[in-house]
């Protein structure tokens, strides 16, 4: 999950994909490791490919574990989510080698519940919001130690 902390209010990059029924699903960027990549390296590469944004991993947010079916096969998937701070790039789907994303958008935190298709990704957003709020409180306490 990539957040642009420089924008106020803070915004999160979401991608839109077409599901097998041809319906648009808005979701967090994700993908699978290539070669000997670490999970963090995979997250940063996938964010860059699917959104055009370069990032820096702040913390792990949790995992989502689910099953889906394709003809004659059930597939188990575990997605490791990280809170990633945007540090450069430009929002674009042009770099997506799989051309899975059909759109990308910066979405304010208060609109994510409505925009995200999957409830389990809303849980990840909640964990990110808690982390960012705690970090803001810590930063404020350091700035004003009284």
Question: Residue ranges of each PLM-predicted region?
Answer:
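Short, charged/polar low-complexity linear motifs in solvent-exposed/disordered segments
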Residues: 27-30, 73-75, 94, 110-111, ...
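Unchanged
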Residues: 33-123
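N-terminal strand-loop-strand
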Residues: 1-28
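A short, polar/proline- and glycine-enriched secondary-structure boundary/capping micro-motif
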Residues: 24-27, 102-105, 126
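A generic structural signal for ordered secondary structure
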Residues: 11-13, 39, 60, 129
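Charged phosphate-binding loop/patch that engages nucleotide di/tri-phosphates or the phosphate backbone
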Residues: 114-146
């Amino acid at each position: 999950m990539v957040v642009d902390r420089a924008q106020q209010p803070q915004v999160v990059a979401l991608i839109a994909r077409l599901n097998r029924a041809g319906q648009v699903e808005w979701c967090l960027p994700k993908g699978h490791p290539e070669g000997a990549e670490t999970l963090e390296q995979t997250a940063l590469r996938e964010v860059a490919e699917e959104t055009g944004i370069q990032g820096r991993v702040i913390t792990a947010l949790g995992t989502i574990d689910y099953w889906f079916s394709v003809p004659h096969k059930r597939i188990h998937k575990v997605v490791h989510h990280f809170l990633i701070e945007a540090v450069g790039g430009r929002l674009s789907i042009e770099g997506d080698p799989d051309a899975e994303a059909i759109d990308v958008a910066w979405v304010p935190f208060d609109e994510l519940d409505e925009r995200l298709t999957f409830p389990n990704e809303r849980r990840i957003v909640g964990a990110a919001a808690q982390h960012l709020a705690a970090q803001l409180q810590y930063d404020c306490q350091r700035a004003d130690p009284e």
